[in-house]
Each structure stands twice: as structure tokens, then as C-alpha cells.
């Protein structure tokens, strides 16, 4: 006799898991709506800071923060942004894979998110610092704390290059890992948005030194917010796919159950009829 009770249990398990993934999809959607409101403002702010600082560095060649475009780093600190939670598709693995592709022997990791901590610890890669207090409520205050740490490391020559690896948000279904160099700052060419009308006093070099923390903070805050949006979008997509797959599997198992149940009933009827005929 077919194992109908086993199939029934399996159908029930799949149905319950689908309910859980659907609930997680709804939670991720709500978080995505909440944090998406910050993205446009953050993009505009970071863009303006980038443009302004490019204008500043175009007018100085002596700052400790500047290097030529052919600069080669011996030791790099990689600031890696992951999530604290799983079930978000390839969000973490794509970022970590990009880091591993570029990592040198002497490099170290500044891990943001518990998944980054556990991943690079498992790879026996040195973690210089770690931050796990990160979610959709990430604030500028927290970003400033990270920015201060990075600035101190660079000024004290612990690293000759600092890069951040995050997930760039393109739209609700498209996001990709990306790298931004924080230090040293490489001059960008052909940016005349502000430079033709701005005059820096006392001079661009002093202004750069006194406001460099604004530059770092804009990058840290912007990339973490963008990564948070990407995380929630990735989790929503992953849970939506899991829910749909669960429903499809439930339908397949239900069809199999009904066929086996129908076969079992038909067999029982045949046995009853056969027994009645034998008695007659």
C-alpha cells in the first residue's frame, strides 16, 4: 500500500515552510519600503560630496591623502559589508567572492556584519576590526565612529590603502558587488561642476585635511545604506522564489498523493469485488 501518511506529512511540512517564507517576504518588503526612502537622498548627498572633494583635490598636490593613479598598494584594508542575517540569496557570497579575488597576502579585513566576520574567520584571514551593530536603522553617528577608526589607521600608516566592498543597488531586482577606494584619493579628471566658480581659502590642502572626515563619512554611510536596501531586496526576492517553489512542490505532492490515494481506493474496491465474487 502506498505510503499516504508520509506524503500527507510532507505536504503539511512544505505548506508550513511556505507560510514562513511568505511571512519573511512580507517583512523584507516592509523593511525595503522603509529604507528605500533614504536611498535617493543618500545618493544625492554622496554625489555632491564626491564632486566637491574632487574639486578640492584638483587644486592641491601635497596632501597626505592623495596619490597618483598608478599608485600600487602593498597592504590594503578591506572594509567588507555583509548582513547579520542569512536567507538573502547571493547578497553576502557575491561581495565576499569579489574580496577574495582581489585580496593580497598582507591584506586585512574590517568586517561589517556578522556574516562577514564568520566568513573571513573561517578562511583564516586576519580581521582587523568588526562591527555587527548594523541594520536598516543605521545612523550617521555610527558611520562617524567607523570613519574615525579608518582615518586613524590610515594616518598612522597601518595600511597604505583602504577600500570598501559593498552591494550597489540598481533597482529592486538588480544589485551587484562593487569596490570603492577610500584612501588614497585618486584625482578624477574632467569634473568642472564646481571648480570653475569655487575659490578655497586659506587653501585647498588645509580644507581637505580639516574636512576629510566628511568625505569618509559620506562613503561609509552611503554604502551601508545602499547595502541595506540591496539586502532587503535580495531577501524579498529569495523568499518570494522560495514561496513560489514551495507552492509548486505542494501542488506536485498533492497530485501524487491524490493519485496514490485513488489507486489505493481502486485496489480496495477491486479486492472487495473479487472477494464477493469468490463467495458467490
UniProtKB/Swiss-Prot annotation:
Subcellular location: Cell membrane
One Pfam family from the record: ATP-synt
UniProt membrane topology term: Peripheral membrane protein
GO biological process: proton motive force-driven plasma membrane ATP synthesis
Domain of life: Bacteria
Keyword Transcription regulation in record: no
Main location: membrane
Keywords: ATP synthesis, Cell membrane, CF(1), Hydrogen ion transport, Ion transport, Membrane, Transport
Molecular function via GO: ATP binding; proton-transporting ATP synthase activity, rotational mechanism
GO CC terms: plasma membrane; proton-transporting ATP synthase complex
Record carries keyword Transport: yes
Function: Produces ATP from ADP in the presence of a proton gradient across the membrane. The gamma chain is believed to be important in regulating ATPase activity and the flow of protons through the CF(0) complex.
Family: Belongs to the ATPase gamma chain family.
Assembly behavior: F-type ATPases have 2 components, CF(1) - the catalytic core - and CF(0) - the membrane proton channel. CF(1) has five subunits: alpha(3), beta(3), gamma(1), delta(1), epsilon(1). CF(0) has three main subunits: a, b and c.
Name of the protein in its database record: ATP synthase gamma chain
Native organism: Mycoplasma capricolum subsp. capricolum (strain California kid / ATCC 27343 / NCTC 10154)
Gene: atpG
Amino acid at each position: 500500500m502506498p505510503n499516504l501518511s508520509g506524503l500527507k506529512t510532507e505536504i503539511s511540512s512544505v505548506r508550513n515552510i511556505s507560510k514562513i517564507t511568505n511571512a519573511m517576504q512580507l517583512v523584507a518588503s516592509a523593511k525595503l519600503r522603509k529604507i528605500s526612502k533614504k536611498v535617493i537622498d543618500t545618493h544625492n548627498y554622496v554625489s555632491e560630496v564626491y564632486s566637491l572633494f574632487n574639486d578640492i583635490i584638483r587644486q592641491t598636490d601635497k596632501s597626505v591623502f592623495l596619490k597618483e593613479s598608478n599608485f600600487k598598494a602593498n597592504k590594503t584594508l578591506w572594509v567588507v559589508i555583509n548582513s547579520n542575517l542569512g536567507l538573502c540569496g547571493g547578497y553576502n557570497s557575491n561581495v565576499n567572492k569579489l574580496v577574495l579575488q582581489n585580496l593580497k597576502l598582507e591584506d586585512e579585513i574590517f568586517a561589517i556584519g556578522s556574516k562577514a566576520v564568520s566568513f573571513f574567520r573561517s578562511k583564516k584571514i586576519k580581521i582587523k576590526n568588526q562591527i555587527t551593530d548594523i541594520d536598516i536603522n543605521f545612523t550617521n553617528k555610527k558611520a562617524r565612529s567607523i570613519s574615525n577608526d579608518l582615518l586613524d589607521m590610515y594616518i598612522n600608516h597601518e595600511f597604505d590603502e583602504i577600500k570598501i566592498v559593498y552591494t550597489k543597488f540598481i533597482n529592486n531586482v538588480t544589485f551587484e558587488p562593487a569596490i570603492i577606494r577610500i584612501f588614497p584619493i585618486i584625482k578624477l579628471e574632467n569634473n568642472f561642476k564646481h571648480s570653475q566658480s569655487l575659490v578655497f581659502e586659506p587653501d585647498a590642502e588645509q580644507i581637505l585635511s580639516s574636512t576629510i572626515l566628511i568625505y569618509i563619512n559620506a562613503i561609509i554611510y552611503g554604502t551601508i545604506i545602499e547595502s541595506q536596501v540591496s539586502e532587503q531586496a535580495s531577501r524579498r526576492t529569495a523568499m518570494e522564489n522560495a514561496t513560489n517553489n514551495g507552492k509548486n512542490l505542494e501542488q506536485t505532492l498533492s497530485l501524487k498523493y491524490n493519485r496514490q490515494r485513488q489507486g489505493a481506493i481502486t485496489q480496495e474496491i477491486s479486492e472487495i469485488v473479487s472477494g464477493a465474487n469468490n463467495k458467490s
